[in-house]
């Protein structure tokens, strides 16, 4: 009888312990469920935040796409500009060659002008000599009337030479005028070439400035891409951490539920054993 009582007390104590463990397991389960719910809420919040980040990333991706298209357009323009620069360089080379030829022609014209001026000077000196001779002949005519016929002959000869020299002078003056016109024409052409060269130089400077501007924009787009990539990696890391935490909590809940189920089975077995003992006592 004492053994039965002792066994009943032990069974009762085991039952109480089982009930305590069951209550503790139920409490742990509720706490775990609350923690799981909190983590689920956190996960939902993180998912919303991740969704917002993805939306923002999509927006920046679209902006990046536009930026890349603009960059490609800028690169195309830069390539076209480089082609224009090469074309302008070739044109400048042709202009420089034409300028060299114009300078050579101008030097030739100046040389001819100098020769014409020398010829005009010689003609002028010849005219002065003839004039001096005519004056001397007139003096001789006044002083020596007996030599009138000879003086007239000398005068006629002098007039003839004078007319010939005058005719040559007219020809030289005409050549001089044409030479001056050609020189002025060459000078005008040189001025036009200089203006065109200035325009080409300014266009080259403008193209270089545009190329630098496109390069600065390209650096800015690359920096934005790097920032967005870092944000995406950070969001993915947070999402992976949240998923691992949820998986860990779900495993903890499963373990607690298994333990609770085991405690319930143990409690059921103890209750059945206690009932059998009570039945045995009643039968006695």
UniProtKB/Swiss-Prot annotation:
Q: Output the SUPFAM superfamilies linked to this UniProt entry.
A: Tropomyosin
Q: Which GO terms describe its molecular function?
A: actin filament binding; identical protein binding; protein heterodimerization activity; protein homodimerization activity
- Identify the InterPro entries for this entry: Tropomyosin
Taxonomy, superkingdom: Eukaryota
According to the UniProt record, which cysteines are disulfide-bonded? none
Q: What is its main location?
A: cytoplasm
Where in or outside the cell it occurs: the entry states: Cytoplasm, Cytoskeleton
Any single biological process term in GO: actin filament organization
Keywords, alphabetical: Actin-binding, Coiled coil, Cytoplasm, Cytoskeleton, Muscle protein
Q: What's in the GO CC field?
A: actin cytoskeleton; actin filament; cytoplasm
Spell out the coiled coil positions from the record. 1-284
Under the heading PROSITE patterns, the entry gives: TROPOMYOSIN
Q: Does the keyword Amino-acid biosynthesis apply?
A: no
Which region ranges are annotated with the description Disordered? 1-37
Gene3D superfamilies according to UniProt: 1.20.5.170, 1.20.5.340
Where do Basic and acidic residues bias regions lie? 12-37
Q: What is the documented function of this protein?
A: Binds to actin filaments in muscle and non-muscle cells. Plays a central role, in association with the troponin complex, in the calcium dependent regulation of vertebrate striated muscle contraction. Smooth muscle contraction is regulated by interaction with caldesmon. In non-muscle cells is implicated in stabilizing cytoskeleton actin filaments.
Q: What family is it from?
A: Belongs to the tropomyosin family.
Q: How does it assemble?
A: Homodimer. Heterodimer of an alpha (TPM1, TPM3 or TPM4) and a beta (TPM2) chain.
Could you give the domain comment from the record? The molecule is in a coiled coil structure that is formed by 2 polypeptide chains. The sequence exhibits a prominent seven-residues periodicity.
User: PANTHER family given for it?
Assistant: TROPOMYOSIN
Q: What is this protein called?
A: Tropomyosin alpha-1 chain
The scientific name of the source species is Danio rerio
């Amino acid at each position: 009888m004492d053994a039965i009582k002792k066994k009943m007390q032990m069974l009762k104590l085991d039952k109480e312990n089982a009930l305590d463990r069951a209550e503790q397991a139920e409490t742990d389960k509720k706490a775990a469920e609350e923690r799981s719910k909190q983590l689920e809420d956190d996960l939902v919040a993180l998912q919303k935040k991740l969704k917002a980040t993805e939306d923002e990333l999509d927006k920046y991706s679209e902006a990046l796409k536009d930026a890349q298209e603009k960059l490609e357009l800028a690169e195309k323009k830069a390539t076209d500009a480089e082609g224009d620069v090469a074309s302008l360089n070739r044109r400048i080379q042709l202009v420089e060659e034409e300028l060299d030829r114009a300078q050579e022609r101008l030097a030739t014209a100046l040389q001819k002008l100098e020769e014409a001026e020398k010829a005009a000077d010689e003609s002028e000196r010849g005219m002065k000599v003839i004039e001096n001779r005519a004056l001397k002949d007139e003096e001789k005519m006044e002083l020596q009337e007996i030599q009138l016929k000879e003086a007239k002959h000398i005068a006629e000869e002098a007039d003839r030479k004078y007319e010939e020299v005058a005719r040559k002078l007219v020809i030289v003056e005409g050549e001089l005028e044409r030479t001056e016109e050609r020189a002025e024409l060459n000078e005008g052409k040189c001025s036009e070439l200089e203006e065109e060269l200035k325009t080409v130089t300014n266009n080259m400077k403008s193209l270089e400035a545009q190329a630098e501007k496109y390069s600065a924009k390209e650096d800015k787009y690359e920096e934005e891409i790097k920032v967005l990539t870092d944000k995406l990696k950070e969001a993915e890391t947070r999402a992976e951490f949240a998923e691992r935490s949820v998986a860990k909590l779900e495993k903890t809940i499963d373990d607690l539920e298994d333990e609770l189920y085991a405690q319930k089975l143990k409690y059921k077995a103890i209750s059945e054993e206690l009932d059998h003992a009570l039945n045995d006592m009643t039968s006695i």
